[in-house]
Design a protein with these regions (language model features):
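Exposed, flexible binding/inhibitory loops of compact, secreted disulfide-stabilized domains
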Residues: 12-170
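Sec-dependent N-terminal signal peptides
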Residues: 1-6
Length: 170
């Protein structure tokens, strides 16, 4: 008789296949700081230039606790989600609006987006992070991070995203 073994592959540095890496338990903070567009153009406050950071803490179970801190977005848009793909050792995250908005507010807010990502192995990865609107189209203009990271179980890896870039509105 023929016996087949099928395995689920996690995104790892030893695996060159597309995996079933996924994000889940996405939550958005309330608006942390609000600035009107007029105020921002007249006199940008130092806090509005605060760098957006992505933190990834890899658990022993392969689940990563992630946070994008201080994402700039329109005040009318309350929910952002995160998509992930992984091929070989490249992880691509896309932070985007959950739904399309017809009416936008004349202000921007800073939000945090928390999510979990699984299953990951310890190791070195090439990470790309994009921002997108609700249509989820993105290119190099929306690339806010492109670099190498090392994930170690039980440790937080933090990267700084390109500053001053709000999520696009489509």
């Amino acid at each position: 008789s023929l016996i087949c073994f099928a395995g689920l592959s996690a995104c790892s540095t030893e695996n060159a296949v597309v995996s079933s890496l996924k994000t889940y338990d996405v939550s958005n903070s309330p608006c942390k700081r609000e600035t009107t567009m007029a105020d921002l153009q007249r006199q940008p406050r130092e806090e509005e230039n605060k760098q957006t950071k992505l933190s990834i803490e890899l658990g022993k179970d392969g689940v990563a606790q992630c946070k994008v801190e201080d994402v700039k977005d329109n005040c009318a848009i309350r929910e952002r989600v995160v998509n992930v793909t992984c091929e070989g050792n490249q992880i691509t995250l896309v932070v985007h609006h959950k739904e399309h908005f017809e009416v936008l507010a004349d202000c921007i807010c800073m939000y945090n987006v928390d999510f979990k990502m699984s299953k990951l192995s310890q190791g070195n990865y090439h990470l790309k992070v994009y921002y997108a609107g609700s249509v989820v189209k993105y290119d190099k203009e929306q690339l806010v991070y492109d670099g190498e990271i090392r994930l170690v179980s039980g440790k937080v890896t933090q990267v700084t995203l390109r500053s001053g870039v709000p999520l696009p509105v489509d």
